[in-house]
Amino acid sequence: MTSAIGNKDMAAPQRVAALNRPNMVSVGTIVFLSQELMFFAGLFAMYFTSRANGIGNGSWKEGAHHLNVPYALVITIILISSSVTAQFGVFAAERGDVFGVRRWFSLTILLGAIFLVGQAYEYFHLVEHGMTIQSSVYGSSFFITTGFHAAHVLAGALAFVVVLLRLSKSKFTPAQATAAMVVSYYWHFVDVVWIGLFITIYFIQ
């Protein structure tokens, strides 16, 4: 009995170590996110260059006039909230709480979907007012930057779906906990990028 208790005591630290120690998946994710950061840095540079040219000829202000800032703020809050739910999902994964992971990640997917639908509605509204990707430099800059970000949100939501599908088909393992953490890293990154885009596009204009 003493031996069994000793083995049980040793198992817990090993399980925690398996969840917390650096691994190639996490390192690879950090490298990938660094590349994504450079990609979005390029988009920001393109946006500000276009802005400088547009302000010079007076076309930029006309395009920004169509933006609905209060509406954009609402969908921004929704996306930021999804980052909170994603982190609660990670906490559940660290505890080995499969039900908690499913609940919080499902809510994250739902919030991400609401954000995407909200952005699609905004696109529809702008197109109705004559602003398209081909209508002006402002239109091109707006749709390219927000469109690429929306694609990343969609990719993140699909990654959460994959994590949930894997949970439904096998026992919960440290590898699955790592996958949950890695996807959350990506999701937090996408949310931070949107905050930067929101401030740049809707407030600085």
From Swiss-Prot:
EC number(s) given by UniProt: 7.1.1.9
Any one Gene Ontology molecular-function term assigned to this protein's record: cytochrome-c oxidase activity
Compartments, record wording: Cell membrane
Catalysed reaction equations from the record: 4 Fe(II)-[cytochrome c] + O2 + 8 H(+)(in) = 4 Fe(III)-[cytochrome c] + 2 H2O + 4 H(+)(out)
Protein's membrane topology: Multi-pass membrane protein
Record carries keyword Flavoprotein: no
Principal location class: membrane
BP term (GO), one: aerobic electron transport chain
InterPro entries given in the database record: Cyt_c/ubiquinol_Oxase_su3, Cyt_c_oxidase-like_su3, Cyt_c_oxidase_su3-like_sf, Cyt_c_oxidase_su3_a-hlx
UniProt keyword list: Cell membrane, Membrane, Translocase, Transmembrane, Transmembrane helix
Family matches, as Pfam families: COX3 (PF00510)
PANTHER family, per the entry: CYTOCHROME BO(3) UBIQUINOL OXIDASE SUBUNIT 3 (PTHR11403:SF2), CYTOCHROME C OXIDASE SUBUNIT III (PTHR11403)
Description of how the protein assembles with itself and partners: Associates with subunits I, II and IV to form cytochrome c oxidase.
Family: Belongs to the cytochrome c oxidase subunit 3 family.
Protein name: Cytochrome c oxidase subunit 3
Organism: Corynebacterium diphtheriae (strain ATCC 700971 / NCTC 13129 / Biotype gravis)
